[in-house]
């Protein structure tokens, strides 16, 4: 029995259960089921209770009680800047969209020197066995001519990508994906030296088409997806810009977050360590 999920569909919770109906009682699987539901980050609290069935003393009934938390957010702002004049930003983010467990977001930031529009969508259960699928599409423009310290240039990037995540243990996933990005640089009378050195000899029109393949791994043992108090999250990723585009490079990233309570009596006090390493290796400029 599942209760308390006024918005979230039952199937979003049931697919995280590891103690199945008509199977042998296993306390470890019940504990794992609770942690997996809590790790979704959709609920303020998750409780699982076992109740004896009166007519069948050798069987128990498991009840799942959840308390939903607000997940959607809408942001909007306006500001003034000496370099960018009026700055506008807006965004919509919704986890567990319409109770389906899917996530989507849209962001808009615009000013006289930069404009960004980005949309992303993730279905964590694209297949019944937990393969996830994500889409991203974005466009970014930047005009540095009004900031003298950056040099005189403009950039215009557009991209779209798709990613898949395949679980192979209760905590581990492997990821793979592909992204296409088109970037065009416009050089003014006083461009940055690194742009002039690279763009003019190798890219006469100062534009590139990048075809980026990626593969990665993650391990998530946190007790909660939004407000963890213990456990860790690791992710390693390799992005490779293939020779199909005008630029070839590899980028390696690694992220580690570790959570631990500072005291045994106060759950809200916790240690939080986040490390991120990133490097980009140029392979070819031909």
Stretches found by the model and what they are:
Residues 7-22:
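N-terminal periplasmic "start-of-domain" segments of outer-membrane beta-barrel proteins
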Residues 18, 23-226, 232-233:
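Gram-negative/organellar outer-membrane beta-barrel architecture
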Residues 60, 265-286:
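Extracytoplasmic gating/loop element in the C-terminal half of outer-membrane beta-barrel translocons
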Residues 140, 237-243, 280-284:
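Short glycine-rich beta-strand segments
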Residues 157-159, 250-253:
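Amphipathic hydrophobic-ligand
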Residues 177, 235-237, 272-278:
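Outer-envelope exported proteins of Gram-negative bacteria
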Residues 219-223, 242-251, 258-268:
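Primarily recognizes Gram-negative and organellar outer-membrane beta-barrels
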């Amino acid at each position: 029995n599942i209760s308390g999920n006024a918005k979230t569909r039952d199937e979003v919770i049931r697919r995280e259960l590891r103690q199945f109906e008509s199977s042998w009682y296993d306390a470890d699987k019940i504990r794992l089921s609770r942690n997996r539901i809590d790790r979704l980050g959709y609920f303020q609290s998750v409780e699982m209770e076992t109740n004896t069935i009166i007519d069948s003393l050798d069987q128990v009934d498991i009840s799942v009680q959840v308390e939903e938390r607000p997940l959607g957010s809408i942001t909007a702002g306006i500001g003034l800047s000496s370099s960018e004049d009026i700055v506008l930003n807006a965004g919509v983010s919704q986890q567990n969209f319409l109770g389906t467990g899917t996530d989507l977001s849209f962001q808009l930031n615009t000013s006289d020197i930069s404009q960004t529009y980005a949309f992303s969508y993730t279905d964590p259960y694209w297949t019944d066995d937990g393969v996830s699928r994500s889409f991203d599409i974005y466009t970014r423009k930047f005009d540095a001519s009004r900031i003298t310290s950056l040099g005189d240039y403009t950039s215009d990037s557009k991209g779209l990508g798709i990613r898949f995540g395949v679980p192979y243990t209760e905590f581990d996933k492997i990821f793979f994906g592909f992204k296409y990005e088109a970037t065009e640089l416009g050089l003014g009378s006083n461009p940055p030296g690194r742009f002039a050195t690279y763009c003019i000899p190798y890219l006469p029109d100062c534009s590139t088409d990048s075809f980026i393949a990626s593969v990665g791994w993650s391990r998530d043992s946190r007790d909660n997806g939004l407000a963890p108090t213990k456990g860790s999250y690791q992710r390693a990723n390799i992005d490779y810009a293939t020779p199909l585009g005008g630029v070839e490079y590899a980028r390696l990233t690694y992220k580690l977050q570790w959570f631990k309570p500072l005291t045994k009596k106060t759950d809200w006090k916790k240690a939080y360590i986040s490390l991120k390493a990133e490097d980009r290796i140029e392979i070819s400029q031909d």
